[in-house]
């Protein structure tokens, strides 16, 4: 099936034009079923060699938030602890071990064999892509998102990924946004400021 039909204006508004980065959320839980549905969308987004290096931790419990709290910057702590869900968007630097399953028509694993540092860049780049897919998938499902990078990655890695090749990238608060927490919308660069034709 060719993807030839554009989304309608309402869908584009929900995903991009009227969507906002949320700083406050309604006191409404997000079910595990919705979070599983979210991942089922995210996993279809393209990554190099279908590598899918992102790993997601959906922090919803009081114990999980308490474990996360010491890593948060002062300005992000209150809103993160109050959010129904905080997603740790991370990436597995040994993602290549799953390539024989994920990319069976070529020996893609051999492309990334060797020291872990040599594949860390690909894990970070493609895991970042998947984190962006997560934000858009959340909006598509009627959730609001508040992505941020104001935290101590080393502390998150020690608390959630100790002894593994998984590294945190950024956090995304999820829930049903409270407009009272929004700032006035900031401008964006125009096409001519940010892009060009060659």
Curated annotation (Swiss-Prot):
Cofactor(s) named in the record: FMN
Lineage: superkingdom: Bacteria
Entry similarity comment: Belongs to the nitroreductase family. HadB/RutE subfamily.
Entry protein name: Putative NADH dehydrogenase/NAD(P)H nitroreductase XOO4267
Enzyme class, broadest EC rank: oxidoreductase
NCBIfam families linked to this entry: PRK05365.1
PANTHER family: MALONIC SEMIALDEHYDE REDUCTASE RUTE-RELATED (PTHR43543:SF1)
Keywords, ordered alphabetically: Flavoprotein, FMN, NAD, NADP, Oxidoreductase
This enzyme's EC code(s): 1.-.-.-
GO molecular function, one term: oxidoreductase activity
């Amino acid at each position: 099936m060719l993807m030839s039909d554009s989304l309608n204006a309402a869908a584009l508004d929900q995903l991009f034009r009227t969507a906002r980065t949320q700083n406050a959320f309604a006191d409404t839980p997000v079910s595990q079923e919705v979070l599983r549905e979210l991942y089922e969308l995210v996993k279809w987004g393209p990554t190099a060699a279908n590598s899918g290096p992102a790993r997601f931790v959906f922090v919803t419990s009081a114990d999980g938030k308490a474990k996360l709290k010491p890593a948060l910057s002062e300005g992000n702590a209150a809103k993160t602890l109050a959010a129904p869900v905080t997603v740790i968007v991370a990436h597995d630097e040994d993602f290549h071990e799953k390539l024989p399953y994920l990319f069976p028509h070529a020996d893609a694993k051999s492309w990334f064999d060797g020291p872990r540092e040599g594949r860390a860049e690909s894990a970070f780049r493609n895991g970042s892509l998947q984190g962006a897919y997560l934000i858009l998938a959340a909006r598509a499902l009627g959730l609001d998102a508040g992505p941020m990078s104001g935290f101590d990655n080393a502390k998150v890695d020690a608390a959630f990924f100790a002894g593994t090749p998984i590294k945190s990238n950024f956090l995304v608060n999820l829930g049903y946004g409270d407009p009272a927490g929004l700032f006035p919308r900031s401008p964006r660069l125009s096409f001519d400021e940010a892009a060009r034709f060659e």
